[in-house]
């Protein structure tokens, strides 16, 4: 809880830093000085630390599949003896997961689940055998679940490290879609340089059949596989499976097809029986973020819900008893950081100052709410595991991202990144000033917007206007944050058009996020 780790800029090391000072404490991993078989690796793409901190999974050779999914070649690094070996030699892996005791790793390869036992010379065994492309997927979501429920993993260990539980997706009845593949870049596909190829996969369009989903468990000692008896509509969803600290309970989330009725079950992996502990019903629809932002710590379930029209937090016990409403008001909780299991304090971010700003808060177990960030703009946080420190990431409409170290008590201890060089470079260009504004429609609805005027703007003159609009649900384009390049890929088209004499305007209309369900 007193330190954090980062990959070095050259991707060769993993370095540990002090949360208190921001200074380097130790080099935990150095690719050029590890022991073991000679391995040629370009660099570290990511890493996963075991619960006991003794083992680190080193992620390399990452290849994207869809928006969030990827395969990679993982290596097991033993921190104590500085030795690294491959997790598996049979092909790239997906979504590896450590067992709570740190002695095993489960992963997915080609739609099947595998298990590696570190105490048995990294012996690898196959857990499922029915996985097949475009038919059966074990432990990782299909395309539509990954895209719409914002997840790339559907597999957990039980708290005693004796069972693996996962969601199985049967997409055999889902209709196929084919899209052309071209040479492209990052990486280039030379086989499509002259003629395009085809990628055919299961793609459920609106109103069509989705995958049939079920939940399973595997007993590591007896090798017995069991189907969990989770109640589900014929066309229902299982958007998430989550571990708890009780080995006899795995949390399974279900949604009806209309997505206005969420149920959370506690399922026993041995008996296969499911007990309903929480239901949440809303007038409109339950956002996918409500499922993924639910936190389960100790005996607590922290549930985001729009049941009163705004996204707020509700604290339950594992048995489904509502302990307290954590937040309330005509604003939205935007990020959920977690619960301090020792105190019951809840850490989150919300736009309590208005839809364009975001601040970080802690809701104490005694009912008192304390604001942890104070600069206007967009604030987010990365907390230490003991909730004594946090990294504050801040920007506003005219200032790029700044990273600072802070204590939960309110003291800033270090500036990690100030981006002064970027701000100086940007100031050299003749750019228009970006400003926020608001107006009220003929229906009495206040809308927020931003505007970029040409440099040397003369209020007495008339200017042509370009309107940029997205308007997607849950999305906000109008924020008090640093953001240049509305079209992505580094194209600062809004400033270019301002240089050509246009006024560029964006307005968040009805249906966009941050302002409650009715809006």
Residue ranges and their predicted role:
Residues 19-21, 78-82, 118-121, 219-223, ...:
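Short loop/turn segments that connect beta-strands within beta-propeller blades
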Residues 24-32, 85-88, 123-132, 226-229, ...:
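Beta-propeller fold detector
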Residues 162, 167, 326, 337-423:
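N-terminal targeting or regulatory segments adjacent to alpha/beta-hydrolase or S9 domains
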Residues 11-16, 66-73, 110-116, 174-179, ...:
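Structural motif
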Residues 22-23, 61-66, 70-73, 127-155, ...:
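Predominantly five- to eight-bladed beta-propeller fold
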């Amino acid at each position: 809880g007193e330190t954090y780790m980062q990959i070095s800029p050259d991707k060769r090391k993993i370095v540990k830093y002090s949360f208190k000072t921001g200074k380097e404490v130790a080099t935990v991993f150095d690719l050029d000085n590890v022991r073991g078989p000679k391995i040629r690796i370009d660099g570290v793409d990511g890493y996963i630390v075991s619960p006991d901190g003794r083992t680190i999974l080193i992620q390399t050779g990452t290849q994207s599949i869809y928006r969030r999914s990827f395969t990679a070649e993982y290596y097991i690094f033993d921190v104590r003896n500085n030795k690294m070996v491959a997790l598996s030699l049979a092909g790239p892996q997906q979504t590896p997961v450590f067992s709570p005791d740190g002695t095993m790793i489960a992963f997915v390869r080609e739609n099947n689940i595998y298990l590696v036992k570190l105490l048995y010379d990294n012996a690898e065994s196959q857990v499922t055998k029915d996985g097949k492309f475009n038919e059966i997927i074990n432990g990782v979501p299909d395309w539509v679940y990954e895209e719409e429920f914002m997840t790339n993993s559907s597999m957990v260990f039980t708290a005693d490290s004796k069972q693996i539980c996962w969601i199985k997706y049967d997409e055999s009845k889902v209709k196929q879609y084919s899209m052309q593949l071209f040479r492209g870049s990052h990486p280039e596909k030379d086989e499509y340089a002259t003629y395009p190829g085809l990628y055919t996969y299961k793609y459920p369009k609106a109103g069509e059949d989705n995958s049939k989903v079920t939940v399973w468990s595997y007993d590591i000692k007896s090798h017995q596989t069991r189907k969990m008896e989770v109640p589900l509509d014929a066309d229902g969803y299982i958007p998430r499976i989550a571990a708890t600290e009780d080995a006899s309970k795995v949390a399974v989330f279900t949604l009806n097809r209309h997505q206005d009725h969420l149920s959370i079950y506690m399922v026993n992996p041995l008996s296969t029986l499911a007990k309903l502990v929480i239901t949440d019903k809303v007038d409109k629809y339950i956002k996918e973020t409500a499922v993924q932002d639910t936190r389960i710590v100790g005996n607590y379930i922290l549930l985001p819900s729009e049941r009163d029209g705004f996204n707020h937090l509700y604290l339950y016990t594992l048995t489904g008893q509502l302990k307290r409403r954590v937040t309330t008001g005509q604003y939205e909780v935007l990020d959920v950081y977690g619960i301090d299991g020792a105190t019951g304090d809840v850490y989150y971010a919300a736009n309590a100052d208005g839809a364009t700003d975001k601040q970080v808060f802690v809701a104490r177990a005694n009912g008192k709410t304390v604001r942890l960030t104070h600069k206007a703009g967009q604030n987010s946080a990365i907390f230490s595991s003991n909730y004594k420190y946090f990294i504050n990431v801040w920007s506003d409409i005219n200032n790029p991202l700044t990273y600072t170290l802070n204590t939960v008590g309110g003291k800033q201890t270090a500036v990690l990144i100030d981006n002064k060089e970027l701000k100086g470079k940007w100031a050299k260009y003749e750019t228009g000033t970006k400003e926020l504004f608001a107006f009220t429609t003929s229906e009495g609805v206040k809308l927020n917007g931003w505007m970029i005027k040409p440099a040397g703007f003369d209020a007495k003159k008339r200017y042509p206007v370009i309107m940029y609009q997205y308007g997607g649900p849950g999305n906000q384009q109008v924020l008090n944050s640093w953001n240049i390049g509305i079209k992505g890929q580094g194209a600062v088209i809004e400033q270019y058009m301002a240089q050509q004499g246009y006024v560029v305007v964006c307005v968040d209309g009805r249906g966009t996020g941050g302002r409650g369900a009715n809006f």
